[in-house]
Structure formats: structure tokens, C-alpha cells
């Protein structure tokens, strides 16, 4: 992306929900590089897919020559943003928040270049300016610039105030002031002139613009990226098991890869615009190719490879593809011990068995069949595979060769029903 028409390029990809004074911002970007920031509050020990679009937006600006600031909210994370939340957030301990700050800082770092000259990225933590601030300073220097009338009319707060079952605490009500001061502080210390964030952050961003103008007489700007939705109306970034996390210990590279592989045809080309750095020409050409091929579309695999490689690196992508190919072909010889551990982590049905269990008992314990009699029938009808190889002997007893890495055996009934045995 080039700097001169960056806003237009983002709009063409569907990446702009709202922008303050679009013409003035476009003119400012055309004049030369600016500094911009996006904040990430440590409300969990990992970022999830919902954070990926604004994070990649920071990267898009850096690739166009601008300087990104990744702000981790060590202070705001102890308060909790009430924006469009139905109820009060649970307050986490300072130790927990500090631990999560470090984890999120490490997650953000690979997406940005912190050593590329004048537009090298900056990592910041708002606890650095809020940690030592006393309440009188907060009220006198920040609070006096805010009208409560305007604050309660912001849509994000109004929704909470209108709920009969829950109001809003002063703690969460004050969050807006904290985020606003972040913008003013980063403007003073790093010349930050633009804040980006999710569309739910619009009220906080405009407050920061107003406060920066009052405190520093600077014109600054805000831009929000859209809330990602799926064509069928269901939530994006959720599976039956919950959120899709960027931390491989919470969502393995294989499960992450499979999430993208399962993208609906109605969504995949739009998601390529949101989550990859492919040009629009490349995406349009891929869509045309898929339409004319008469085969299953290639786009899901392109999307899965791009995003998994970006988040989990070459090794994570290789493992995800290796597991996928092995389960599809039934040939498990290329799988590593860590690959089997990923399957267990991802929620593949797993059962622990003593080493004297036979195949019939294993099928029953694995809940692949209801009884030993049914197990005999399934085995005899060639419907059971051990580590990808069919086994037709109803009296079969496992051998050491079946215990891959001395501990794992993958049972399959039919084509889709799996269970991973972990041998005791």
C-alpha cells in the first residue's frame, strides 16, 4: 500500500468503518509519514481473532511508511472497557494483569518491525503514565475537560444505563477518560496523530481527539475498522469450543488452520481482503479462477496458509498442514509426537487405556461403539482403522507397533469418527 491514497485503499478492502474528517486525514497522510497507535487491553492471557484486523491495520500503515505504536493497557486493563458490554467486567489482580501485559506484548511484536529506521514500531504501556498519577491530578487535569452530559449520551454507555438489570460503576464509567488521555499522552511523547481501533471504540477515540485538542492544541484523527461478521449472521472468530486465540497453547496451529479452511464460500474472498496482504488483483483473480475451475475453491487453503503462517510462523503452518494431510490420507507416518499432542489439546476425543486393553474394549471405552458386540460387528465389516490402517480381526490385540511414540494410537470408525488413545 502506498501512503498517498492509503485511506482509499483500506476502504476498497472494506477495512474502514468510520473515520474522522476523512479529507483532512487523507491530506495529512499525503504530506508524509505520521505516527499512529492502537491499544490492546490485557483482559485475557492472549489476543484472539477479533484483535487481528486492527493489529494488521497497524502493519499496513507501517508498510506504507508510517510509524506504529502498539499500546498495551497495563492500566486500562485493570479497569475494563464497558463499551457495548452487557455487564460489569471482572476486575483482575495487578499481578495477573502484569503477566498478561507481557504475554500480549510478545504476541504483538512479530507483526511489526521494531528496527527499520525512522518508522520503527514503538511498544508502550499506559501504566507508565497512570501508575504514578494521583486522584487529584486525574480529576483536575483530565476530568475537568469532560462533560458528564456528553459521556452518558455516548452509545456505548447509554446501552448500559438503559438496562434494568445492570447499570455502570464509576470505575467503568471513567474508562473513557483513561483511553482519551492515552491519545493525548502519546501525542505529546511520540507525536501520535491517529488512533485506530475496532468500531466499538469510536466513542473512546473521539474523546481522545477532543482531549488532545484541549490539552495540546493538536489536530488528530481517528479511524475504526468494522466488526467482522459472517454471511450467515453468526459471530466471527468463535467455534463450538469458544474463541479462536492467537496463543498456540490455547488454540493449536492445526485448529487455527482448520478454522480458516472451514470458511464459507460466501465469506472467503472478503476475509482474504481483511486478513492477508494479497493485492485486490490477486484476490479477484483467485475468485475468478475458483468460479471457472469446476472444482472445490482454492481460496480457503490460500487464506488458511496466509493467516496461519503469519500468526504461527513456518513451523506452525507446516505442522497444521502435516496433521491435516495425515488425517485426510490416513497415513500417520509423517506426524510428530507434538502433532498428536495438538490433537489432544484441540479436543479430539481422547481416552486413557491400560496396555492390556484389546481393540473391542478400546472402541467401547472410546465411545465409538456402545458394546463389545457392536465393536465385533464394526471390525468385521472393515469399518475400523488403527493409525489409518484397516483392521478386520475382531480379536485383535494391540502391539507396541501400534503405540506411536510409545504412547499414542489413533482409532477411526467409519470416515469421520476419531478417538486418540493415550496409553498408560
Curated annotation (Swiss-Prot):
UniProt-annotated binding residues for L-tyrosine: 37, 175, 179
Organism for this UniProt entry: Yersinia pestis
Subcellular location: Cytoplasm
GO molecular function per UniProt: ATP binding; RNA binding; tyrosine-tRNA ligase activity
The keyword Nucleotide-binding is annotated on this UniProt entry: yes
CDD domains with a match to the protein in the record: S4, TyrRS_core
Residue span(s) of domain S4 RNA-binding: 357-414
A Gene Ontology biological process term: tyrosyl-tRNA aminoacylation
HAMAP family xref list: Tyr_tRNA_synth_type1 (MF_02006)
Source domain of life: Bacteria
InterPro entries referenced in this protein's UniProt entry, alphabetically: aa-tRNA-synth_I_CS, aa-tRNA-synth_Ic, Rossmann-like_a/b/a_fold, S4_RNA-bd, S4_RNA-bd_sf, SYY-like_C, Tyr-tRNA-ligase, Tyr-tRNA-ligase_bac-type
Name by which UniProt lists this protein: Tyrosine--tRNA ligase
Record has Ion transport as a keyword: no
The protein's assembly and partners: Homodimer.
Motif ('KMSKS' region): 235-239
Entry's EC annotation: 6.1.1.1
Swiss-Prot/TrEMBL keywords: Aminoacyl-tRNA synthetase, ATP-binding, Cytoplasm, Ligase, Nucleotide-binding, Protein biosynthesis, RNA-binding
Protein role: Catalyzes the attachment of tyrosine to tRNA(Tyr) in a two-step reaction: tyrosine is first activated by ATP to form Tyr-AMP and then transferred to the acceptor end of tRNA(Tyr).
Segments crossing the lipid bilayer: none
Motif 'HIGH' region: positions: 42-51
A Pfam family it matches: SYY_C-terminal
Amino acid at each position: 500500500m502506498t501512503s498517498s491514497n492509503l485511506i482509499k485503499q483500506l476502504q476498497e478492502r472494506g477495512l474502514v468503518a468510520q473515520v474522522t474528517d476523512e479529507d483532512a486525514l487523507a491530506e495529512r497522510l499525503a504530506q508524509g509519514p505520521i505516527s499512529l497507535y492502537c491499544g490492546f487491553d490485557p483482559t485475557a492471557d492472549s489476543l484472539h481473532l477479533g484483535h487481528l484486523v486492527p493489529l494488521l491495520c497497524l502493519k499496513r500503515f507501517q508498510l506504507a511508511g508510517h510509524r506504529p505504536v502498539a499500546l498495551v493497557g497495563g492500566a486500562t486493563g485493570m479497569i475494563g472497557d464497558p463499551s457495548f458490554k452487557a455487564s460489569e467486567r471482572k476486575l483482575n489482580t495487578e499481578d495477573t494483569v502484569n503477566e498478561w501485559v507481557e504475554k500480549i506484548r510478545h504476541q504483538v511484536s512479530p507483526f511489526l518491525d521494531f528496527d527499520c529506521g525512522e518508522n520503527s514500531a514503538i511498544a508502550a504501556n499506559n501504566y507508565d503514565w497512570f501508575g504514578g498519577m494521583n486522584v487529584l491530578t486525574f480529576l483536575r487535569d483530565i476530568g475537568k475537560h469532560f462533560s458528564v452530559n456528553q459521556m452518558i449520551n455516548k452509545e456505548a454507555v447509554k446501552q448500559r444505563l438503559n438496562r434494568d438489570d445492570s447499570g455502570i460503576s464509576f470505575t467503568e464509567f471513567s474508562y473513557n477518560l483513561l483511553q482519551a488521555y492515552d491519545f493525548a499522552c502519546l501525542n505529546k511523547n511520540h507525536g501520535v496523530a491517529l488512533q485506530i481501533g475496532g468500531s466499538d471504540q469510536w466513542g473512546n477515540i473521539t474523546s481522545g481527539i477532543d482531549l488532545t485538542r484541549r490539552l495540546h492544541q493538536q489536530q488528530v484523527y481517528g479511524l475504526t475498522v468494522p466488526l467482522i461478521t459472517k454471511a450467515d449472521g453468526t459471530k466471527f472468530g468463535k467455534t463450538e469450543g469458544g474463541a479462536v486465540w492467537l496463543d498456540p497453547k490455547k488454540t493449536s496451529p492445526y485448529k487455527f488452520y482448520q478454522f480458516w479452511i472451514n470458511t464459507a464460500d460466501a465469506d472467503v474472498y472478503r476475509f482474504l481482503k481483511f486478513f492477508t496482504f494479497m493485492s485486490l488483483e490477486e484476490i479477484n483473480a483467485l475468485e475468478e479462477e475458483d468460479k471457472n475451475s469446476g472444482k472445490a475453491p482454492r481460496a480457503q487453503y490460500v487464506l488458511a496458509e496466509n493467516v496461519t503462517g503469519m500468526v504461527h510462523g513456518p513451523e506452525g503452518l507446516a505442522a497444521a498442514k502435516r496433521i491435516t494431510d495425515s488425517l485426510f490420507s490416513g497415513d500417520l507416518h509423517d506426524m510428530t509426537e507434538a502433532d498428536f499432542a495438538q490433537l489432544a489439546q484441540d479436543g479430539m476425543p481422547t481416552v486413557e487405556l491400560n496396555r492390556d486393553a484389546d481393540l473391542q474394549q478400546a472402541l467401547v471405552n472410546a465411545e465409538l461403539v456402545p458394546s463389545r458386540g457392536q465393536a465385533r460387528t464394526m471390525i468385521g465389516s472393515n469399518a475400523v482403522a488403527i493409525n489409518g490402517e484397516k483392521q478386520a480381526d475382531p480379536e485383535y490385540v494391540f502391539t507396541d507397533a501400534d503405540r506411536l511414540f510409545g504412547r499414542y494410537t489413533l482409532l477411526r470408525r467409519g470416515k469421520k469418527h476419531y478417538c486418540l488413545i493415550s496409553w498408560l
